[in-house]
Amino acid sequence: AAPADPRVLTGHPARTPRRHTLAVPDPVSGIRSSVAVWEYTPVPVAAPGSPGAPEGDAAAAPLVFVHGFRGDHHGLALLADALPEHPIHSIELPGFGASEPFPHAEHTVAHHADAVAAVIAALGLPAAPVLVAHSYGTTVAAELVAREPSRWGRLVLLNPIAEPALQASASLTSRVLAAVAEGYYEVAARLPERPARLLLGAPPVVWVTTLAMTRTRDRDVLAYTHDQHRRHFSGFASARMLSEAYRASSTGSVADVAARLTLPVLLVTLAALAVRLSVG
């Protein structure tokens, strides 16, 4: 069973975010749809100047979170818990979680980046924020930051997509799994919505997907991941929208815009090894 108290995993009490709903324009038609943004207000952990208190830019830096494929704000909730002193806005991409899908635009990396840009503009954050993204969200975040690097303080990419899943340099196993997944989402998109959702959200499929995606021997972490996927992995607008987003996640990568990321970038890999890069 998943730990009842997330402090078992983070060492910090859970933070409860407040939901905001912002209207963003469709990148094609301009028609507005709602995007959910979850705000975590900072919790002081130490008095300024005392041991353990954050210093310099870290003390004030607002964070913006962007989740991964088939995710929502819950996917980065433990990270928010572990960073209590930071104000955080966790954005649910159009079509995922509580956010509406685009009325007309395809759900691509560029269009999702457009939506995040519109949300950031509406929030009017007071300082250059740090953008933190996971998995598919890393391609969206990299695309956005590459357009205007000076707008951002830093970029943090958690388990970034370094190359397209079907690229020849990937392992044969990776390419086969990616091809199977692509077919799975394409088939679901062609079904009526009810059977498509039954296929996409089938418990055995979600369970196997979790095992394939998870690299840990920690039973608490594995149980928590299974529980989160069971609860939130089917929070998407439609099978068609999900197929579009999967296509975007499997054909794009952070490498597409790496040369334009002229700001400090932190990469965190599956092995939990962090490498700080100052690019440019």
Each predicted region: which residue ranges?
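The conserved beta1-alpha1 loop
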Residues: V64-G68, H134, T269-L270
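Gly/Ala-rich beta-loop-alpha elbow adjacent to hydrolase catalytic centers
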Residues: V132-G137, A141
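Conserved acidic catalytic loop of the alpha/beta-hydrolase fold
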Residues: A110-A128
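Flexible "cap/lid" loop of the alpha/beta hydrolase fold
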Residues: A146, W152-R194
